[in-house]
């Protein structure tokens, strides 16, 4: 066996040992409570004011993943301008719920001052005095920080919220459950996409005069009545 071959062999063994040591020492990533394969990209979101096309993502979870967080936030939005790829939120509501007890620890309703006011003159005058999108986005970021977001047929709402945050440079880390999708999984009939209609099937009674906030209450009621997750 030649000397040069031995040298190359030793170098190869040392190199292999270094690689294996590096792999063993690599820290494992912490789970955020949602399976990686369920990451759903919300892509091609055209955001105002410059209509830049960006790729943004939210993590879609199963309802069973709710146990990984102490809270969940039920959200609903009112938008103008078409689908979530080019719309703007003009009103928003959410309730934050302690998962183990069902206690509502926070609730929020607000109009949102839009960027394209010239297109919204037909809307209520209260938009002129509404909080800016940045202020509302900061409020959402704080609410979402230790919670999973929930809604009924909620994908477009999630897309609109992410786009709003992007506009004002408030990047939102959203993990969400779509209650409509969860109901469809085990149901052979066509389900109504109106959360009020579905909740009333289970005996829901109106709790708020604000339609968006009442939709949040209806969604939360539906979740508990359907017994998706033991408390």
Labelled PLM ranges:
Residues 211-224:
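Acidic, divalent-metal-coordinating active-site segment for phosphoryl/phosphodiester hydrolysis
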Residues 51-55, 59-166, 170, 196-204:
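Conserved non-catalytic scaffold segment of RNase H-like nuclease domains
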Residues 224-231:
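The feature marks non-catalytic terminal segments
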Residues 188, 207-214:
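Active-site metal-coordination segments of metallo-dependent hydrolases
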Residues 3-17, 21-73, 77:
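N-terminal accessory regions of nucleic-acid-interacting proteins
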């Amino acid at each position: 066996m030649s000397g040069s071959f031995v040298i190359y062999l030793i170098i190869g063994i040392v190199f292999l040992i270094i690689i294996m040591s590096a792999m063993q020492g690599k820290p494992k990533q912490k789970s955020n409570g949602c399976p990686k394969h369920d990451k759903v990209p919300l892509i091609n979101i055209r955001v105002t004011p410059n209509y830049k096309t960006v790729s943004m993502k939210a993590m879609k979870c199963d309802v069973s993943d709710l146990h990984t967080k102490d809270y969940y936030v039920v959200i609903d939005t009112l938008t103008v301008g078409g689908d979530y790829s080019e719309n703007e939120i003009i009103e928003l509501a959410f309730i934050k719920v302690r998962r183990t007890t069902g206690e509502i620890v926070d609730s929020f309703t607000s109009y949102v001052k839009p960027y394209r006011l010239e297109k919204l003159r037909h809307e209520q005058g209260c938009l002129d005095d509404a909080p800016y999108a940045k202020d509302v986005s900061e409020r959402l970021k704080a609410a979402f920080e230790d919670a999973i977001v929930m809604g009924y047929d909620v994908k477009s709402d999630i897309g609109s919220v992410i786009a709003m945050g992007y506009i004002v440079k408030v990047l939102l880390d959203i993990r969400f459950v779509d209650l409509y999708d969860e109901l469809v999984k085990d149901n052979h009939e066509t389900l109504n996409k109106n959360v009020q209609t579905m909740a009333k099937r289970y005996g829901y009674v109106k709790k708020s005069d604000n339609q968006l906030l009442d939709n949040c209450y209806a969604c939360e009621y539906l979740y508990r009545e359907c017994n998706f997750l033991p408390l």
